[in-house]
């Protein structure tokens, strides 16, 4: 019987490299595919694409798999980056990784892999896929959290649909990150000690304000307290996010004291795009930073339809512990009511729903409400 062909996204990082080796060990015919998705500043100090390609090709040679490169820069700009800029211009805080996964890594990439004769695709994400084998949902594919809860990336994958998940393997879903590093060292992979990538999906680490300046128009405006007192000037609403503490420019101001006599820090609490006003508050637990419920749109359900369960758990940001809530959904979106108020629920971010380890899907946060 012919081996199943798996095309794996190889980024030059440790996770995808070890994933390629694991797949080969499991008996698959493995082909590596390196994606180039950003071209605006190939020669800048922040662009790591050349080194990433060298690392990916070197690993492929060690592991013994063929690798090729594909350019999705146009697709990335049209499907991901344009929306990223629109959201920031509207005063929201988007998460490009969510859209990048749905549109590039598991759409453009999947389409290209099929042209290469792939039976399946794979990535180095920490998540799991499971097929339901009995009952009324038999044949349906579920997206599950990774065994390593500290690295779980199901939050970023919640927009994947049944067709995408049915064609996807996550070799690291059952493995802890420490074990992945150990395998890379034992194999003497050239990137065994390479640090994990951070920053904007495929754009990388760079001074964020300087980067946005190149693409967005912005206008300074007033910074106000909830009482309407102007305490400073912001440099443009796009450069701030709810819950932000650093970089506001009011570190020396003192007007509110804790019981120990120290001034409480300022936090970004709201952005009023209509009046170009940034509202800031003092104290981590200020009521304006807490939300008892939220509404979300642009929803995507892993099963293809909204969950029937009313009581679920949710994350409103990556690395947040699941929080208990009740959900109601309709054709326009869904709403969540939290069992306990949540901190800095941010429009533009994703609210992702879970039932235990099963990721149900989610949507983009539109609004949130402070506790009554």
Swiss-Prot record:
GO biological process: tRNA wobble position uridine thiolation
Highest taxon of source: Bacteria
Gene3D superfamilies assigned to the protein according to its UniProt record, in alphabetical order: Adenine nucleotide alpha hydrolases-like domains, HUPs, Translation factors
UniProt-annotated site: Interaction with tRNA, residues: 125, 349
Keyword Chloroplast (UniProt): no
EC assignment: 2.8.1.13
Keyword 4Fe-4S: no
Signal peptide: none
GO MF annotation terms: ATP binding; tRNA binding; tRNA-uridine 2-sulfurtransferase activity
Major site of localization recorded for this protein: cytoplasm
Catalytic residues in the record: 100, 201
Catalyzed reactions: S-sulfanyl-L-cysteinyl-[protein] + uridine(34) in tRNA + AH2 + ATP = 2-thiouridine(34) in tRNA + L-cysteinyl-[protein] + A + AMP + diphosphate + H(+)
Paired cysteines (S-S): 100-201
Cellular compartments annotated: Cytoplasm
Region (Interaction with target base in tRNA): 95-97
One CC-aspect GO term: cytoplasm
Segments for region (Interaction with tRNA): 151-153, 317-318
Record Pfam families: tRNA_Me_trans (PF03054), tRNA_Me_trans_C (PF20258), tRNA_Me_trans_M (PF20259)
Function of the molecule: Catalyzes the 2-thiolation of uridine at the wobble position (U34) of tRNA, leading to the formation of s(2)U34.
Homology family: Belongs to the MnmA/TRMU family.
HAMAP family: tRNA_thiouridyl_MnmA (MF_00144)
Name by which UniProt lists this protein: tRNA-specific 2-thiouridylase MnmA
Organism: Janthinobacterium sp. (strain Marseille)
Gene this chain is encoded by: mnmA
């Amino acid at each position: 019987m012919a081996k199943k062909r798996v095309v794996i996204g190889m980024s030059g990082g440790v996770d995808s490299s070890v994933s390629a080796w694991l797949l080969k060990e499991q008996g698959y015919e493995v082909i590596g595919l390196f994606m180039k998705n950003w071209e605006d500043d190939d020669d800048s100090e922040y662009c790591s694409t050349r080194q990433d390609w060298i690392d990916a090709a070197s690993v492929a040679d060690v592991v013994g798999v063929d690798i090729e490169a594909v350019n999705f820069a146009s697709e990335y700009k049209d499907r991901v980056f344009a929306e990223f800029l629109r959201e920031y211009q509207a005063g929201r805080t988007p998460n490009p990784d969510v859209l990048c996964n749905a549109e590039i890594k598991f759409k453009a990439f999947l389409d290209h892999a099929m042209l290469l004769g792939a039976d399946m695709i794979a990535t180095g994400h920490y998540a799991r896929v499971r097929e339901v084998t009995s009952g009324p949902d038999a044949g349906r594919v579920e997206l599950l959290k990774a065994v390593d809860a500290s690295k779980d990336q199901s939050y970023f994958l919640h927009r994947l649909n049944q067709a995408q998940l049915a064609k996807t393997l996550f070799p690291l879903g059952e493995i802890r990150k420490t074990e992945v590093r150990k395998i890379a060292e034992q194999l003497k992979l050239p990137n065994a000690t390479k640090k994990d990538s951070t920053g904007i999906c495929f754009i990388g680490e760079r001074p964020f304000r300087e980067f946005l300046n190149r693409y967005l128009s912005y206008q300074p405006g007033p910074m106000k307290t909830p009482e309407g007192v102007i305490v400073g000037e912001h440099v443009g609403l796009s450069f701030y996010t709810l819950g932000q503490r650093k970089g506001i420019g009011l570190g020396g101001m003192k007007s509110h004291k804790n019981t120990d006599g120290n001034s409480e820090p300022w936090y970004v609490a709201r952005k009023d795009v209509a009046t170009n006003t940034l509202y800031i508050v003092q104290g981590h637990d200020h009521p304006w930073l807490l939300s008892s419920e939220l509404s979300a749109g642009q929803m995507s359900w892993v099963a293809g339809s909204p969950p029937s369960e009313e009581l679920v758990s949710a994350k409103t940001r990556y690395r947040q512990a699941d929080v208990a809530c009740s959900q109601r959904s309709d054709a326009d979106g869904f709403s969540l009511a939290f069992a306990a108020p949540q901190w800095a629920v941010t429009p533009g971010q994703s609210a992702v729903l879970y039932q235990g380890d099963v990721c149900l899907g989610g949507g983009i946060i539109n609004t949130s409400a402070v506790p009554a």
